[in-house]
Amino acid sequence: MGTVLSLSPSYRKATLFEDGAATVGHYTAVQNSKNAKDKNLKRHSIISVLPWKRIVAVSAKKKNSKKVQPNSSYQNNITHLNNENLKKSLSCANLSTFAQPPPAQPPAPPASQLSGSQTGVSSSVKKAPHPAVSSAGTPKRVIVQASTSELLRCLGEFLCRRCYRLKHLSPTDPVLWLRSVDRSLLLQGWQDQGFITPANVVFLYMLCRDVISSEVGSDHELQAVLLTCLYLSYSYMGNEISYPLKPFLVESCKEAFWDRCLSVINLMSSKMLQINADPHYFTQVFSDLKNESGQEDKKRLLLGLDR
């Protein structure tokens, strides 16, 4: 029974190759067949591995060749660009160093024409004088300074000379009229600070110089016209939007006051805008007001000499 069990596997193996009894030869044959199969498997694996290695090597060479080719082409492009730039630089250098020939000079005119042209030029030069060129392109800057009290005194003297019919008018009277209006507006709270300043006095003088006539017959009339000019000065130069009318009225009829205001506006509107926009005009009016005091001194001197 043990023999049968030991031979039964060999019998099954033997049937794989050929029919026959199970012997030791069959075992060797089976073993040889196994070895042959192993050899064949090894050969096939070796054969399959060798082409794979070759394929990998070939693909690596192709990749290296692809990587190398762009570098070589890039180097070729760089050398080509360098050559082109060198050619351009040489051409630019040639253009920059190129010197144009001097233009041909016209032929000299005959001596007779030359003498005639010279005499004509000299005569024309003698006839046409050179225009005078001013050294200073801008107008001369004039600086004038004066205090408020000094300008008010000049304004009072101007009014006294203008209204020559008013024999009892003093230069301080117009100043008192102006000061009283300014003080009343301060006390009533219509303004935070006094309006009587040098600039505003200059503006008032500009109005009075063209509005107040020399035919004024009374102090009351002069005061009415002067306060009308003062009201317009407040309205144009003051800090507040509006001012009360009562401090400026010296008569019961308001229509007469407004009529004077309209006439002054129609007459002096352009100059009121000019003195605010043109500093040279303001300086000129300032100088004229300051010179009013000097004119009074000259008048007194002439009266003394006549006596």
Swiss-Prot record:
Q: Which UniProt keywords apply?
A: Biological rhythms, Cell membrane, Cell projection, Cytoplasm, Lipoprotein, Membrane, Myristate, Nucleus, Phosphoprotein, Ubl conjugation
- Residues that the record marks as modified (Phosphothreonine) are T138
Q: Which GO terms describe its biological process?
A: axon guidance; axonal fasciculation; brain development; cerebellum development; embryo development ending in birth or egg hatching; ephrin receptor signaling pathway; G protein-coupled acetylcholine receptor signaling pathway; G1 to G0 transition involved in cell differentiation
Primary gene name: CDK5R1
The role this protein plays is: p35 is a neuron specific activator of CDK5. The complex p35/CDK5 is required for neurite outgrowth and cortical lamination. Involved in dendritic spine morphogenesis by mediating the EFNA1-EPHA4 signaling. Activator of TPKII. The complex p35/CDK5 participates in the regulation of the circadian clock by modulating the function of CLOCK protein: phosphorylates CLOCK at 'Thr-451' and 'Thr-461' and regulates the transcriptional activity of the CLOCK-BMAL1 heterodimer in association with altered stability and subcellular distribution.
Which InterPro entries does the entry mention? CDK5_activator, Cyclin-like_sf
Q: Where is this region: Disordered?
A: 97-135
N-myristoyl glycine lipid modification positions: G2
Annotated site residue numbers, Cleavage: F98, A99
Q: What is this protein called?
A: Cyclin-dependent kinase 5 activator 1
Please tell me one Gene Ontology term that the record gives under cellular component: postsynaptic density
- UniProt-listed Gene3D superfamilies: Cyclin-like
Q: How is it modified after translation?
A: The p35 form is proteolytically cleaved by calpain, giving rise to the p25 form. P35 has a 5 to 10 fold shorter half-life compared to p25. The conversion results in deregulation of the CDK5 kinase: p25/CDK5 kinase displays an increased and altered tau phosphorylation in comparison to the p35/CDK5 kinase in vivo. Myristoylated. A proper myristoylation signal is essential for the proper distribution of p35.
Phosphoserine occurs at which residues? S8
Q: Name one Pfam family in it.
A: CDK5_activator
Tissue localization of expression: Brain and neuron specific.
What family does this belong to? Answer: Belongs to the cyclin-dependent kinase 5 activator family.
